[in-house]
């Protein structure tokens, strides 16, 4: 009897092994032209570009969570700002001679115009529907107090008038005028306090999660697109023919499959660094990451929400990094208006909100540990700021809110944990390691795999970032007449700058506003607000900001 039992057991094991081998073989035979790792706005945007450029290419998207747009792209996990430098003061640093540098602001604004054109084109194609579900006009304002800050904002306003991209901006130091623009900010404020504000009517609030869901829903209508949820990438291996075999685990049933892809895009947010390292490409050795989270105070009280229609950004305190810039924002989430204030930085070793506490440790290697240490030593202000933020009490956060909303009541607000952002640290020959501003596309020399690292300015520039990726990875195709024609249909201003061309700027803003249902009035001539004589400033090194 024991022999029979043993025989049956051996047969069962053998049959199971044969079955597993058959499944493995079947999975190895699954092929796709493009594998998109991550179900966020970056993968959705790249997939949408490629659907128009090469409609016959097969695409597979894998997402670890049970739905798309549940991490950083989720509307509640970011500030929903259409970053265009209309109000973000850290994009216009003050030079040592006191002058204002606008180069970064112009670049950020140019990038957002590409996003607007991309979204407008998708609305016209029927890919994106009901623009008000994902983008709404919300004026963008800068607000400061104190003589030095007022002088800075006045000079910033004057400097930005050199650009055609900022012609609609208005400036005021009048309490009554600013109260009309942002009642919550001014009511209860000391009437003798010296304040100033700028306001641009064409600012936007954007629900990047909704854009992501709609783009992916459109991709799913094609038979050569596959979406696999609850699917986690466990391994990436380059094949001899420069294709990639990617092992994907089904988190629901515990099985694994192999996907053979000609091109792999790692758009997994905070998880992108670890997957890039897993690929083994030499370019990955130059990078490390440092996670920073964010919290917001949220109010859904109609008395608060209906009294505020603007995104109001302030100025970082002296000695604080740009990421500390507070803002009080109108948001449109889940079909209703709310007001958010923050962000307050938090620290966790997770690279994703739904990540692992081991993320930071597991991404630390012999290649990047020294650059990380150098960055910590060279950016002590940042370290000090993060420590101070982690130590904030409920009362501390409320006092910070009252600087922007003097009559705020505690009972109207609750604390919300937003998403995680991973700041790029790159090895540097001179400094050992440096914090990299913005986002960075990292690819292999063969152009078979690419990853997006970084956090700022984030989702608002998904369209230009993915356009940059196309140029970097598919350079020969991008230069072809076919791709050139298609790209110019998607982004009418592709290949040229709007800055300095008033007619082109107004034409594109008018077009995108009409299609997206946004407010746009032709700008009037700028006022003659005098530029102050600013004091010379000490040279300040750049510090990475967080796009929350």
UniProtKB/Swiss-Prot annotation:
Q: Which residues form a coiled coil?
A: none
InterPro entries under this entry? FAD/NAD-bd_sf (IPR036188), MQO (IPR006231)
Sorted alphabetically, the Gene Ontology BP terms of this entry are: tricarboxylic acid cycle
Q: What is the catalytic activity of this protein?
A: (S)-malate + a quinone = a quinol + oxaloacetate
Disulfide bonds, which pairs? none
- Cite the record's Low complexity compositional bias ranges: 530-541
Family, according to the entry, reads as follows: Belongs to the MQO family.
The name under which this protein is listed is Probable malate:quinone oxidoreductase
């Amino acid at each position: 009897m024991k022999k029979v039992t043993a025989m049956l057991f051996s047969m069962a094991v053998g049959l199971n092994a044969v079955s597993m081998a058959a499944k493995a073989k079947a999975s190895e035979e699954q092929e796709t032209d493009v594998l998109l790792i991550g179900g966020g706005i970056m993968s959705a945007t790249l997939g949408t570009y490629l659907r128009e450029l090469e409609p016959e290419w097969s695409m597979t998207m894998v997402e670890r969570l049970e739905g798309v747009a549940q991490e950083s792209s989720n509307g509640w996990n970011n500030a929903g700002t259409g970053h265009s430098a209309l109000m973000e003061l850290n994009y216009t640093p003050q030079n040592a001679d006191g002058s204002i540098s606008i180069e970064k602001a112009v670049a950020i604004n140019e990038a957002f115009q590409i996003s607007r054109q991309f979204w407008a084109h998708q609305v016209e194609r029927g890919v994106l529907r009901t623009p008000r579900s994902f983008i709404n006009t919300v004026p963008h304002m800068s607000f400061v107090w104190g003589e030095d800050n007022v002088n800075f904002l006045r000079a910033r306003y004057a400097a930005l008038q050199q650009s055609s991209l900022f012609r609609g901006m208005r400036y005021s130091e009048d309490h009554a005028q600013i109260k009309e623009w942002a009642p919550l900010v001014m009511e209860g404020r000391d009437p003798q306090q010296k304040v100033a504000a700028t306001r641009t009517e064409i600012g936007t609030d954007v629900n990047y999660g909704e854009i992501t869901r709609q783009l992916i829903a459109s991709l799913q209508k094609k038979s050569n697109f596959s979406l696999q949820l609850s699917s986690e990438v466990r391994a990436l291996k380059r094949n001899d023919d420069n294709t990639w075999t990617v092992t994907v685990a089904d988190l629901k049933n515990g099985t694994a499959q192999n996907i053979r892809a000609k091109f792999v895009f790692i758009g997994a947010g905070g998880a992108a660094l670890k997957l890039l390292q897993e690929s083994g490409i030499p370019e990955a050795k130059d990078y490390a990451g440092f996670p920073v989270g964010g919290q917001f105070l949220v109010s859904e009280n109609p008395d608060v929400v209906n009294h505020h229609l603007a995104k109001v950004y302030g100025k970082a305190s002296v000695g604080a990094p740009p990421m500390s810039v507070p803002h009080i924002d109108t948001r449109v989430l889940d079909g209703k208006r709310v007001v958010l204030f923050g962000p307050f930085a938090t620290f966790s070793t997770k690279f994703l909100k739904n990540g692992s506490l081991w993320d930071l440790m597991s991404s630390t290697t012999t290649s990047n540990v020294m650059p990380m240490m150098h960055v910590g030593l060279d950016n002590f202000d940042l370290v000090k700021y993060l420590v101070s933020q982690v130590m904030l009490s409920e009362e501390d956060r409320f006092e910070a809110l009252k600087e922007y909303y003097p009559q705020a009541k505690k009972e109207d607000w609750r604390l919300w944990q937003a998403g995680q952002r991973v700041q790029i640290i790159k090895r540097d020959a001179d400094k050992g390691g440096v914090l990299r501003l913005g986002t960075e596309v990292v690819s292999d020399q063969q152009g078979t795999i690419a990853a997006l690292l970084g956090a700022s300015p984030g989702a608002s520039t998904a369209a230009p970032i993915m356009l940059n990726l196309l140029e970097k990875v598919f350079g020969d195709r991008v230069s072809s007449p076919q791709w050139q024609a298609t790209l110019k249909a998607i982004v009418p201003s592709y290949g040229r700058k709007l800055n300095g061309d008033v007619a082109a700027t107004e034409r594109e803003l008018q077009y995108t506003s009409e299609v997206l249902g946004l407010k746009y009035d032709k700008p009037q001539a700028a006022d003659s607000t005098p530029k102050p004589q600013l004091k010379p400033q000490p040279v300040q090194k750049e510090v990475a900001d967080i796009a929350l």
